[in-house]
Structure formats: structure tokens, C-alpha cells
Amino acid sequence: MYPQGRHPAPQTPGQPGFKFTVAESCDRIKDEFQFLQAQYHSLKVEYIKLANEKTEMQRHYIMYYEMSYGLNIEMHKQTEIAKRLNAILAQIMPFLSQEHQQQVAQAVERAKQVTMTELNAIIGVRGLPNLPLTQQLQAQHLSHTHGPVALTPPHPSGLQPPGIPPVTGSGSGLLALGALGSQPHLPAKDEKNHHDLEHRESTNNSISPSDSLRTTSEKHRGSSDYSLDSKKRKVEDKDSMSRYDSDGDKSDDLVVDVSNEDPATPRGSPAHSPPENGIDKPRPAKKDTPRRPASVASSGSTPSSKTKPPEHNDKSSTPGLKSKAPTPRNDAPTPGTSTTPGLRPILGKPPMEALAAPALRTPLTCPTPFAMMSHHEMNGSLTNPGVYAGLHISPQMSAAAAAAYGRSPMAGFEPPHMRAPGLPASLTSISGGKPAYSFHVSADGQMQPVPFPPDALIGPGIPRHARQINTLSHGEVVCAVTISNPTRHVYTGGKGCVKIWDISQPGSKSPVSQLDCLNRDNYIRSCKLLPDGRTLIVGGEASTLTIWDLASQTPRIKAELTSSAPACYALAISPDAKVCFSCCSDGNIAVWDLHNQTLVRQFQGHTDGASCIDISHDGTKLWTGGLDNTVRSWDLREGRQLQQHDFASQIFSLGYCPTGEWLAVGMESSNVEVLHHTKPDKYQLHLHESCVLSLKFAYCGKWFVSTGKDNLLNAWSTPYGASIFQSKESSSVLSCDISADDKYIVTGSGDKKATVYEVIY
């Protein structure tokens, strides 16, 4: 069928050679593959080794970071003690005779002259007087680990060795680091385990990264103390969490407040703050900062604590409100929380109980100078909550850092990825190493720390501090407070009622009257007295405003004003008491004629709930802040919007200075910004560590107060924000008011009470 030529041709002499070439090529490819595989294996081993070394370096970094915190806390504490002792000496010296005064003065001056040699002798650095400070520290640290003293070569001028913070001033804080490193009593068991660890690491290059994540103290434990099994480590993490309790209920117990250790200072009374744009002593830690790295893993990974988006939430006692990120769930009971079901959702500001509950943050949301950090998840390798699971620092390391988690007193200790977003490293501290908390922001966005004048905290009308004189147990989360004029009665708004307290009677523990308004399960968000003190207007999570007649023998409802919005977040009264302005959850500003009890106008502009409001002293201009990240001003004579200021954060509170010019704005981002009503310049203040929930100017206009979810009450000078005093309460501070004579401050908080402070001048 097919031609003969189609049959297979006879083999040619070259064909066997072709077969040999294919086999040889296959062998060659196989050899090359094996070579590449060996090379790959070698590189993989090297990679794992480098990963282990990196993890080890990060672990050491965390240890040094904790030590730095503790030592700086101790340094500032000792500095404050020295200042107080100097003040006592200065007060006592005039009682001495002239001759003794001179002798004592000379002795005091001699005591202040501490040389480097004496410091080295005190902390046990002998024989190394001429070495640079960082090399002395390394020498001491290596000496107690029984390793050779391998000093690093000097670094180029102006540069610091990695992992060692820059030394500012006399460096006394880091000199103490050497004292810690030179402790001679390393336990024998630790020494043995240390050498065992070195042997294991040198003989096993492919040790898994998870093993190397164990910290020094974990490796020093006996083999019965832990297992490599990940399930058991999760159990240990859970135990660690139970030791530290939840962020919700017991985190206040973990606050380290060295400023209140003086027994002469009453609980709750604020410590005096220096006029510098920085601190002389640490301020109280907030509850949503990590207590210590040991609790990093057990804190859990939670989203940044923004408020809920609008949704049906049958488990919250207050309706869910719109924001940009979900509120993390907190299973632990918190002050002021309730599980009343069946409440309808309302758009707008965060729920009161969400604000009252302690904030939950991502682990390692670093405690920083005056909350200049991002309150969201940080960038960088340290944010993974699983990286340092079960991280425990050895007793030698953690002893000095027990009180470490207040605000960082020295900004130089923060790595670049842990600084405030948008805040250059050069701005986080000023001369002397003190962290700046007040910044001037120019029209082009340039930020500079504010140099406070010498009389920043001195002068008529500037208070020295405030002391707590009364606690009013309301029984529910206090979302609104106001003080009568003259100062006699305090009005506290909670869930479904306003209670009236007579603070002119010392020790009064019960209200003189209770005004039931709105629905029983709805929170009062604002209550305002008319200037005559005879009428109270109440607004909250309902569509009606209630007008109370207080002049009658028994307070009674005089009228109700109904709007189309489901909630009112804030109220303002015109100086002539003829008009009431209400911030509505739909973003509108309702204008009410109080005489005719009618709605006369609505200002429309906010695209989300209007959260806060204030009116100028002459009654011609209105300022409003909203959850749409804007602050707007309105001309009340012409009924139009004048200005709009855009921010990167939701606006929770604002106040307009009674003397004009300045507007202070409290934000969800924890900043307070002070704006000029005509100039583009502004001041940015960084003492709060969570959202700023309320703000109020003193009637003299020289100072104002702000309160926050971080439990803090801060008093600031106008306009540049020198810190006058600070008080820490036991829960989120949701509302505040100042009496007309500027002598009293009242705050409402999430632990179901209001606190009355007397302002001391």
C-alpha cells in the first residue's frame, strides 16, 4: 500500500552517538539540578539563621525599650523628688541664722556638683572612666552574661548605635541602665540555661523561628514550665490575659501614676504641671496602652477603637452610631455597661456606653509622649500580635520597668515607625529632652513646638490646680452636666432622666430632684440652663427636646419641641435666651424660637451627624462640629455658612472662647486643635491619649478644659495650650462644665457618677 521508501531506514553510524548525547545531557541537567538544590538548601538555612538573628535582635530591642521606659520614669520621678526637696529647703532656710544660711546654701550647691567619676563610682563602673557612655553600658551588659567584653568601635560623629537611644542632657537616665546591667546576682540556674542555650543555637542552625521568639526568661525556665506545643502556649497566653485582667474592667488597677505617690496629694487631685512644653514627671498611663510587653500577646488583636457604623444592635443599651471602623467587642463588664435589648438604632455620635467603656487597642499601640502616636495599628514588624506570644522579660530587666507604661518621658526612645504620623522626629522633643505636647501649625502646615512664655501659668485668672470636693452618684453613665448660676445646683443627665444636686450642702449624697424625660432607655446627651436659671432644656436620643419649668414648686415639663431627626447631640442657647440651637443626628442644626416654641430655621451643611456646638459671646456667630470631619461657622443674622474647616478626624467637641478669637476643637484622633477665627495659624495639643469627648472654656477666656475617653481632665491655657493641671478619673470622662465664676468644674463619667472640682487660684 505504501511505497518501499516509507519503511524505516537502516541505522546510520551517527545514530548511536545521538542517543549518547541525550543521556549525557540528562545526566548533566540532573547534576545541575542537584547543585541548585544544594545551593537552595544552603541559602534556606542561611535565611532561617538570619531570621532567627533578626527575631533575637527584636527581642533584645523590646527588652532595652522596656528598660528605657522604666529608667526614664525613675529618672523623672527622682528629678521631681529633688525639686520638691529643694523647695522645702528654700522654705526652711529663711528660718536659719544668716551664718547658717550661707553654710547650708554652700552645702546644697556642693551637693549639686556630681562629677562623672562620682557617677561611675556610684553605679559601679570602675576602670572605665574614659570610655564613651554607650561602650560602658555594653561592657556592663556583657560582663554579667559571662561573655568577653567586646566593645563596639566608635560611631561617626552625631550618630547613635542602633538600638541605643540618643543621650540628652547629662544622660543620667541611661547611666542608670548600666547599674541595672551590672547586677551581680544572676542565678546559677540562669547561667546554666544561658550556656545550654548558646550550645543549642551553635549546633542547630535550622532552629525554627517560633522557638527563638521565646524570651530570655522563658528560656531560663525549667523544661516542665512550658512546652513547644503551640496549643499549650495558647493556654499560657490565656493565663497571662487572666493575670492582667481585661481591658474592660480592671485595667485601671494597672495604671502607674507616679505623680500621685506623694501621700500629701489627695486622690484625684491633679499634680502641678510645669510651664514648659514638656514634662518634668510622667503623666498617668492610660488603660488602652500595653501594661508591659508581657501582655502583648494576651491583649488580643483588636481594631482601632473607632465608633460603630449604623446598624441594628440589640445588645447595646445605646444605639449604634456611624463612624469609619467597627468598635471592638469587649466581653468583660465595664463601668456603665448594660445589656438592655430592643433599642432602635440612631445615626451619629458614638454610643455613650461605647465611649464609657475603656478603649481596646491593637497590641503595642505604644505609650508615647502625650499620645502623639497613631491610635490605629502601627506599621512595622512589631505590630503582629503573635510575634511575641508569651513574651516575658527576666526579673532583672522588668524590675526597673515596673512603672514603665506611662507616657514616654523621652521621645528619643521611639523608633521611627512608632512616632506620631506626620510628626517629624525633630518635633517630638524640645531642648532638654522633654517631649513637646503643644505645637504651632503655620498656614503651610509646618509644625513647631511652642516656646511657652515665662508667665504661661502665672497671672490673674490662671488657676494653679483643682481639687475634688464632691462625688455625685447618678447611677447611670453621666453624658451631660451643667452648673447653675449662681453656683448652687448641678444637673446630671443619664439614661432617661436628669438629676438635680445641691452642692452648696457639703456631703450631700442624694439628688434634690429627678426629672424624668425622653424614654426610659434613652440617654440624655445635653442639658442647658437659660440665663435666668428658671428653665432647663434637655435633648438626647429622641426626636423631642424637653423644656422644664424649674421655678414652680415641683419642676414640670413646660413644652416639648419635636424635630424630624431621631436624636439631638448638643444644645446651645443664645445670650438673650430667645433662641435654642440643637445639633441633630441627621447633620442639620435646628433653630428654635423658645418664646413661640416653634422651629424657625435649619442650617444644612454637615453631611453626617452634628456632634457639638457653641455660640459666640455676642450671639452673632455659631460654631458646629460634625462626624463628617468638619467644623463650620454660621452667620446668625444672615442665616448662612461663613467658614468650613476640614480635618482628618471626626469632631466630638468644641468651644468658642468667650473673649473671642479662639476656637478649641476636640477630636476623635485624641488631638485638641485651637483655631483662630480669622488667621490660618492654629495650635495642636497632644496630651490626650484617646478621643476628646467634651470641651469647655472658662468664662474669663484665659483657660479651658477638655475631657476624654482616656479618663483624663486636662486644663489648658488659651491659646497655646500650656498644661495647667491634669486629673485622672476612674473611667471615661464624657462631659464637663465650668461655673460662671470659674471656681468649679463638674465632670460626668462612664462609672455612673459626676465629680465636682474646686479650682484653686
From Swiss-Prot:
**What's an example of a GO molecular-function annotation for this chain?**
transcription corepressor activity
Report biased composition (Basic and acidic residues) as residue ranges.
187-202, 216-253, 278-291
**Which top-level group of life is the source organism from?**
Eukaryota
Q: Where are the transmembrane segments?
A: none
The UniProt entry lists the main location of this chain as nucleus
Q: Which PROSITE patterns match?
A: WD_REPEATS_1 (PS00678), WD_REPEATS_2 (PS50082), WD_REPEATS_REGION (PS50294)
Family to which the UniProt record says this protein belongs: Belongs to the WD repeat Groucho/TLE family.
Q: How does it assemble?
A: Interacts with pnx. Interacts with the WRPW motif of ripply1. Interacts with tcf7l1a. Interacts (via C-terminus) with lbx2 (via N-terminus).
- Protein name from the UniProt record: Transducin-like enhancer protein 3-A
Which gene underlies this protein? tle3a
